[in-house]
Amino acid sequence: FLFFFLTVVFFQVSFGQNIEFIYELVYRPNVDDEKTNKEYFSLLYDTDQQQSYFKNITGLEENWASKNEIGFNTQVFKNFKENKFYLLDKVLSKFYKNDFKKINNWMITNDSKYILNHKTYQAKIASGGRNWVAWYSAEIPFADGPYKFNGLPGLIFEITDTENNYSFKLVQILKSNKNIILPNYTSLNDDDLKKLKKKTLENPSSNLMLAINQMKGNNMGFSVTFDNKNIDEKEMAEQLDKEIKEFNKTFNNPIEIGDVWLK
């Protein structure tokens, strides 16, 4: 990624189409290790509908490649017209929708600096058990930013927590013909989602075995291949349990302190 484009677009301003903001995230997945991971994200902003969609795009193009395992799978949808905001959390292969409120308790300071030739101003906030420092620019008049951060008088160019566990930086701005298309999801409130994550971590293969038993009940056949070998349902369950628990040992520093991190 050494030649990753730092593209600057000067808006003069007729926002008649969608705009895609590419962010680089550098974060510490493990609280007991200083090693960092690097991943890339798209914030697709629909200028007509005033809504946005944030998701991981690591590996989709050569410039967005990463040597580490992708760990940050949370997607975020924001609809500023209707004041609707929600996270789409991935638990195994399914997405679960969890609403959150618009962020409006920023503390704006007098500090400023230039980022990508745009003048930005500093703002601070406490969120998810962390203290964050953001840099935003009113030159791009969208009250949006990476992850669930929003509510400032301009686009967030950078935001980092004060312990340097997570750091988002805007690296590219693109005109886009893409449309916002959300994955299928199930709605859960915050408490129920946390319970589901904890239950899944305790026994990751339980839902898989339930689905297999349902297929058997419907006389549906199935086979699973792992490492080019056919494996039975018991081996499949053991492999899934091992994979999820090993992932959780490495990825134990979620962006929201106290959350359970699942792939």
Can you say where each PLM-predicted feature lies in the sequence?
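A sequence-composition feature that detects small, non-aromatic residues
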Residues: 7-9, 13, 65, 123-126, ...
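Short, surface-exposed loop and linker segments with low hydrophobicity and enrichment for Pro/Ser/Thr
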Residues: 12-19, 78-80, 142-153
